[in-house]
Amino acid sequence: MKHLPEQDAQVFKAIQLERKRQQDKIELIASENFVSEAVMEAQGSVLTNKYAEGYPGKRYYGGCEHVDVVEDIARDRAKEIFGAEYVNVQPHSGAQANMAVYFTILEHGDTVLGMNLSHGGHLTHGSPVNFSGVQYNFVEYGVDKETQHIDYQDVLEKAREHKPKLIVAGASAYPRQIDFKKFREIADEVGAYFMVDMAHIAGLVAVGLHPNPVPYADFVTTTTHKTLRGPRGGMILCREEFGKKIDKSIFPGIQGGPLMHVISAKAVSFGEVLNGDFKTYAQNVIDNAKQLAETLLSEDIQLVSGGTDNHLVLIDLRSLGITGKIAENVLDEIGITVNKNAIPYDPEKPFVTSGVRVGTAAVTSRGFDQEAMKEVGSIIALALKHHEDEAKLEEAKKRVSDLTARFPLYNELDY
């Protein structure tokens, strides 16, 4: 960085400290990743200066001929990756992508069937503290109490009983594959639209390592970060027949000008997905998650559903006698970043929880392999089992430092 250190030392210092935190700690928050330098360069480009309300070829501002090219590249690449008929890359976030779909097909008070937040769903799938739960009549489905897999019979029975206008599949803390075909069949039986929020698994879907919802769903929403390893943002994929309505819901419906610098970064990251190396990366993400799960289980740490099919693992802490809030703080002290997370049928409050969610997308981008994940799992088990033993925690902290030193991050950055 050339100008920021002199112009704004306070902000520069905070950025430096965050850079150091990312280097010195093991990032296991399942919704985070490390983008490439090329993605960061695109996002920090002169495109941040350009207003471009509207869509390519139909803008409300002049001078959009070059940003039109960028947005078309992003849309075309997304279509190619996911086999979608229509794509909108303008949503600023996954939440706004979901909002746009709801505004396209729902009226205030319509019934929607979505996954219970504490069972792995998302705030925008009907939580009463979110706009979705305020605007619409959400009915919740969840996971089976024994298997902790989605209870498709429960989904079917609730769909038959409540006749929702929309069924939402997808999750923020569900470690198993989702059967989109079953959801489609249920939606067809009751005459509902079907939407999939694939924010967490989009990178796995992109290269065929998780079933693709696009052939089954009327609408698919996603973030562009997480396993897709792009900039923070959202995207909607849908059938051609809904394309113009979706566009109108985004602009002028819920957004004004698109963030063209972010859309350029989306285009770059989609280009990276189309590179053959991305499939190897995504497979390593899954392999690392499975190795982490296996190591934790071998240490008698309980996992929701007993393991994982994707990038995330949900740890059930009840047998250890600690809460998610305590575990998050303990792990942060030794240099491992996670988030407390509710588990199915959780007796604790949302800000306390009985679980923590961990994911392998970021550490895999950093180069961690399965041997490294064995060590990570061993360190987590040590810290959680001995969370009040300062000597054990110091040992764990040293092992974290040894690991992070082996896998440097962003070597070419000059700050």
From Swiss-Prot:
Stretches of the chain forming a coiled coil according to its record: none
CDD domains hit by this protein: SHMT
InterPro entries referenced in this protein's UniProt entry, alphabetically: PyrdxlP-dep_Trfase, PyrdxlP-dep_Trfase_major, PyrdxlP-dep_Trfase_small, Ser_HO-MeTrfase, Ser_HO-MeTrfase-like, Ser_HO-MeTrfase_PLP_BS, SHMT-like_dom
Cofactor(s) for this UniProt protein: pyridoxal 5'-phosphate
BP GO annotations: glycine biosynthetic process from serine; tetrahydrofolate interconversion
Site for Plays an important role in substrate specificity, residues: H225
Pathway: One-carbon metabolism; tetrahydrofolate interconversion; Amino-acid biosynthesis; glycine biosynthesis; glycine from L-serine: step 1/1
Annotated residues for binding of (6S)-5,6,7,8-tetrahydrofolate: L117, G121, H122, L123, E241
SUPFAM superfamilies the UniProt entry points to: PLP-dependent transferases (SSF53383)
Reaction equations catalysed: (6R)-5,10-methylene-5,6,7,8-tetrahydrofolate + glycine + H2O = (6S)-5,6,7,8-tetrahydrofolate + L-serine
Family to which this protein belongs: Belongs to the SHMT family.
HAMAP family assigned to the protein according to its UniProt record, in alphabetical order: SHMT
Record text on subunit structure and interactions: Homodimer.
Function in brief: Catalyzes the reversible interconversion of serine and glycine with tetrahydrofolate (THF) serving as the one-carbon carrier. This reaction serves as the major source of one-carbon groups required for the biosynthesis of purines, thymidylate, methionine, and other important biomolecules. Also exhibits THF-independent aldolase activity toward beta-hydroxyamino acids, producing glycine and aldehydes, via a retro-aldol mechanism.
UniProt-recorded name of the protein: Serine hydroxymethyltransferase
Lineage summary: Bacteria, Bacillati, Bacillota, Bacilli, Bacillales
